[in-house]
Amino acid sequence: FFNNMAIAMERLKRDGKISKALVLDIDLHFGDGTVNILGGRGYATLVNPSSNSPSDFIRQVDKALAAETYDVIGISAGFDYAREDWGGVLGESDYTDIGRMVRETARKSGAGFFAILEGGYNHRVLGHNCMALLEGMREG
């Protein structure tokens, strides 16, 4: 199988563009493929917030972003934690906040940042939530 996040991180590492990376996996489902590939590499920290509370979820994201300085932050952007999806937790404004937090953290440290769409099951809201994350990533 292919794992888009692992391919992106491995390429950046192989090309000498990064030493330390954060994978922020905001998908409801644990990213075991990402962990299986990157978990033992030593340069990548993988964080998969999990909560039934939007504020607690955001606190976990904030804690992960503040823990260390990274050369790149990659968001595994699954949107099944959305209120209108299986997870039933995060709203559009939460996704905007996550994007903004990643952008601000990356800019402070000079890191790069990107997101890879990993999924979401409710197609009526998937595009809106994806746009909300991207809006946060591009603001300012």
Predicted regions and their residues:
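A general "terminal functional-core" signal
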Residues: 1-140
